[in-house]
C-alpha cells in the first residue's frame, strides 16, 4: 500500500507578520515585473497564499503600490541614515555614503530595482511620491554638506548632484564593474560634489582639499 505524504501545515502568521511577508514578496514582484505591471495574483503566488488573502490586506492595487513604495522609501532612507557618520570629515562622510549606496544594490537588489523603475515614472501617479523621496535624500545630503559649508549658495545643487550619482552607482553594481572602477567613480562623484559646493567669486570651482 503506497505511503501517503502529508503536506506541511501552512504556518499561521500574526496579521502584522503576514502583512510584512506580503510586502516583501510584493517588492520582489515589483522588481521582476515593474511597478506598472505587478499584480496581487503574482504576489499571492510568490507568498504561497490565496489571492483573496492578499486582497484582505490590500483592497486595491493602489493600496499594494503604496505599501511597496513606502517600504522601498523607508529602506533607502534607513540606509542613508545608518551610513551617516556626523564626526567624519566631509569627504570621508560622502565617500562612506556613496559606498553604502552602491552596496545596497547587492544587499537589497529588489529594493534598488524598484527604486530605479520608480525614477522613470515621470507621467505616472507615483511620480509625486518619488519627488518626495528625492527631496528627503537631498535634504539629508544637504545637511551633511552644510556641516562644513553652511553658507554655500550651491548647497542645493551639490546635494542634487550627489543624489543623482546614486542612480549611476546602482547601475554600475548591476553591471558588475570592477571594484577599482567603482572606487574611481565614487572618488570622482565625491570630488565633483565638493567642487560644486565651493565656487570662487568668478564662478569657477575651487580646488578640493
Regions found by a protein language model. Give the residues of each.
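N-terminal intrinsically disordered/low-complexity leader segments
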Residues: 1-17, 28, 200-209
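Helix-turn-helix
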Residues: 21, 25, 29-63, 67
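Short, charged helix-capping/linker segments at alpha-helix termini
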Residues: 34-37, 147-153
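Short, basic, alpha-helical segments at the C-terminal edge of helix-turn-helix-like DNA-binding modules
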Residues: 40, 70-76
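Hydrophobic alpha-helical connector segments
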Residues: 67, 81-110, 158-162
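Amphipathic alpha-helical packing segments from all-alpha helical-bundle domains
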Residues: 74-80, 124-149, 156-160, 184-187, ...
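Short secondary-structure transition hinges
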Residues: 103-139, 171, 175
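Hydrophobic alpha-helical segments that form the core
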Residues: 152-175, 183-195, 209
Amino acid at each position: 500500500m503506497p505511503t501517503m505524504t502529508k503536506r506541511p501545515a501552512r504556518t499561521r502568521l500574526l496579521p502584522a507578520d503576514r502583512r510584512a511577508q506580503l510586502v516583501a514578496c510584493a517588492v520582489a514582484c515589483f522588481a521582476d515585473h515593474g511597478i506598472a505591471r505587478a499584480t496581487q495574483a503574482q504576489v499571492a503566488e510568490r507568498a504561497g497564499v490565496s489571492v483573496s488573502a492578499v486582497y484582505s490586506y490590500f483592497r486595491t492595487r493602489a493600496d499594494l503600490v503604496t505599501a511597496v513604495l513606502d517600504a522601498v522609501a523607508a529602506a533607502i532612507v534607513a540606509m542613508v541614515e545608518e551610513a551617516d557618520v556626523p564626526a567624519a570629515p566631509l569627504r570621508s562622510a560622502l565617500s562612506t555614503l556613496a559606498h553604502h549606496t552602491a552596496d545596497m544594490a547587492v544587499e537589497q537588489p529588489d529594493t534598488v530595482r524598484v527604486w530605479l523603475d520608480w525614477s522613470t515614472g515621470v507621467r505616472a501617479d507615483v511620480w509625486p511620491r518619488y519627488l518626495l523621496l528625492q527631496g528627503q535624500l537631498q535634504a539629508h545630503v544637504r545637511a551633511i554638506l552644510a556641516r562644513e559649508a553652511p553658507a554655500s549658495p550651491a548647497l542645493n545643487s551639490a546635494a542634487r548632484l550627489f543624489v543623482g550619482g546614486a542612480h549611476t552607482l546602482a547601475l554600475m553594481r548591476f553591471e558588475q564593474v570592477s571594484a577599482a572602477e567603482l572606487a574611481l567613480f565614487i572618488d570622482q562623484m565625491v570630488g565633483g560634489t565638493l567642487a560644486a559646493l565651493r565656487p570662487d567669486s568668478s564662478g569657477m570651482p575651487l580646488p578640493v582639499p
